Amino acid sequence: MTLLNAPDYDDRRETRKRSLLIGAAAIVGLLILLTLGGFIAGHGWLFSNLPAEHKVSSFFSALEAKDYDKAFAIYTNDPDWKQHPERHKDYPIDRFTVDWTTESPVKAPIVSHKIDISKTDGSGTFGTGIIVAARVNGDKKLFMWYQRSDGTLTEPAPHELSGY
């Protein structure tokens, strides 16, 4: 093919190519923004820690409502724990209730909470767990550990978040 018999200029094809390039650039830009935004906001890359934050928030909401059975189910990640209480003989519901009322980490029943920030911790790409920082009963800081492998919660977390 020579310049003298080149195909005719197709305006629609060029417009489509330009639109696809702009769209691809916008998607890549949005992905970068979401990735960095989640990390900077303290919710993990691409907001990957949000499920753990929601679980901790649900746990505290159950404690505020004095629904200790539901809170225990969330804490142990075992919604059917009443079917097999022998699995939790090392940490039964009675001890759990005492630990989260009169002997709670804030030395009082939980009446309010706010999830502030979370950080991935441990080995691997997304870590073995997540430390979720919350303020309970006003301004008391509490750090909960969310174990990725089994979905259980633990208090206290292995360590506190620095700079929080």
What residue spans do the PLM features occupy?
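Prokaryotic Sec-type signal peptides and long signal-anchor helices
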Residues: 63-64, 100, 130, 147
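Short solvent-exposed beta->alpha transition segments
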Residues: 58, 69-135
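Short, low-complexity N-terminal intrinsically disordered segments enriched in polar/charged residues
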Residues: 3-61, 65
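Compositionally biased, intrinsically disordered/low-complexity regions enriched for serine, proline
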Residues: 4, 102, 106, 153-155
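Short beta-strand edge/turn micro-motifs at domain boundaries
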Residues: 2, 11-14, 19-20, 133-164
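Broad hydrophobic/π-residue packing in well-ordered secondary structure
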Residues: 59-63, 74, 140, 152-154
